[in-house]
Amino acid sequence: MFCEKAIELIRELQRASDGQLPAFNEDGIRQILEEMKALYEQNQADVNEAKTEGRSDLIPTIKFRHCCLLRNRRCIVAYLYDRLLRIRALRWEYGSVLPSALRFHMSTEEMDWFNQYKRSLATYMRSLGGEEGLDITQDMKPPKSLYIEVRCLRDYGEFEIDDGTTILLKKNSQHFLPRWKCEQLIRQGVLEHVLS
C-alpha cells in the first residue's frame, strides 16, 4: 500500500521515548525513495499519455500518486528533522563527546551535522563573556542563590571580586561569595561549597 513504509518510519520514532535515538533506518529511507521514484515514473508516463491521447480519466490517478509523493516527502523530512532535534538535545545533555552507543545509531551525515553544531556552539560561547567566553551549557537550571558559602581548602592568596573588594583566601577560612566567581576555584580544588 502507498505511504505505508513512510508511516512506519514515523511510528518508529514515536516508539522511542524522549532522549533516546533509535538507529538510523537507512533501509527504510531507501525503500521510500524507491517507491517515490516508481510513483514519479508512473505519473510521468500517465501525464504524457493524458496529453497525447487526451485521456482525462487518468487525472485522478495522477493526482492520487502526486499526493502520495508529497506525503512520503513530508514523512521523510519529519523523520530527519526529529532526529536532528534529538541529536541537538544530546549535545546539551552529554556535552561535546557522545557515548559510542549513541554514535553507533547515527548516520555519517548526522555525525557531520553534530560536529558542525558542536563547533558552532563552541564559537558562539567563546564570543560571549570576554576573554574566557561563557559556557552556556553549564547551568541548565538556574541556581537557587547568587551567593554561596565556600571554605578555602588551601592557601590561595588574594582574590578580587568584580566590585573591587579583595579577599584573602587562607586555608580553612570561610567566605560568602558570588557563585559564578567561585565555580572555577571550586573546580580547581581551591574552594569547596559548604552546604548548610
From Swiss-Prot:
Subcellular location: Nucleus; Chromosome
GO biological process: DNA replication; DNA strand elongation involved in mitotic DNA replication
SUPFAM superfamilies the record matches: GINS helical bundle-like (SSF158573)
Database matches in Gene3D superfamilies: 1.20.58.1030
Family: Belongs to the GINS1/PSF1 family.
Subunit structure of this chain's protein: Component of the GINS complex which is a heterotetramer of gins1/psf1, gins2/psf2, gins3/psf3 and gins4/sld5. Component of the CMG helicase complex, composed of the mcm2-7 complex, the GINS complex and cdc45.
Protein name: DNA replication complex GINS protein PSF1
Species the sequence originates in: Xenopus laevis (African clawed frog)
